[in-house]
Amino acid sequence: NMKLTKINYNILVYLPDDIETMKGQNILADDFNMGAFSVTVLENMNAKDILKLEDKIRDIDGVAKVITGYDALGTEIPASILPTDIRSKLSKDNNDIMLITYNDATSADTTLNAVTKVREITKDACKVGGMSAMLLDTMDLAQREITIYIVIAVVLCILVLELSLNSYLVPILLMLNIGMAILYNLGTNLVFGEISYITKALVAVLQLGVTTDFSIFLYHSYESKKDKYKTKEEAMTEAISETFISVLGSSLTTIAGFLVLCTMKLTLGKDLGLVMAKGVLLGVITTLTVFPVLLLYFDNAIEKTKHKSLLPKFTHLNNFVIKNHKIIFTLFIKIGRASCRE
């Protein structure tokens, strides 16, 4: 399902139709039958080579028109006879400009394929600009880097959890649980048909950040109840009940917060809000179903890998806050007022 879910790299489709940019784009498409276009800079090419290149580009599927200054001048008339202000807009420092228009919209597959073929034909001889070219670069950059920062986020989370929890194995099990929830979320995005590349890039790290606490709470609850019940199954049953009651309020407020994004005129908010609200819900479900199974199955291994807490207990800080709570509250109010004034 993850592979079947289409990723939209065109940010323009999320803009409301009543803004000037979209009105202008609709007029160009409806009244002038003009789809996407690219402005291409040709480096150190003579007139004959440019005209030959035009013919090759015109043969590419999806290309509507190819225009350069040499369409009017030909190869016999030197560009130097043109007025300086006109010549400077068409050619400068041995660089010429070529305008390529396409039959379809900026993010259409035919347009993106055409831009790719233009780059293949011209290689290093030219630089292709425009929204379609930017979309291709964005797609390439997003696909290359998304895995890198997800791995970094997971490694950092495991390091922090190794310090804060009392078992070396639990952080790994916790990441497996959250990883399953993230995969479920990405797979079920198929119900939306497509999601934006921004949502795809953010969803894994955001879901990791907002749902990790649910699993930590379940683990602590389970550990506190193991000595109170005869079997670990009974302890887990009580831990699940306690966790459900505790995380219900926080998860619902988190879901509500993401759903508020759906009210934005920029519909990218709706795209991100729905996916993240679903992700939080799936995070709660896996915490109450998958994670308990992992804890019970690896219970003996968890006991063998237990260690002393590596973080300080912050006893002095706790005592300081309790003794000076009035002073801290007053400072908080004053800092808040000062921030509002600025």
Place the predicted regions along the sequence by residue.
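Soluble periplasmic/extracytoplasmic beta-strand elements of cell-envelope proteins
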Residues: V39-E43, I97-T101, K127, S215-F217
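Membrane-embedded transmembrane helical bundles of large multi-pass transporters/channels
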Residues: N1-Y9, V13, T106-R341
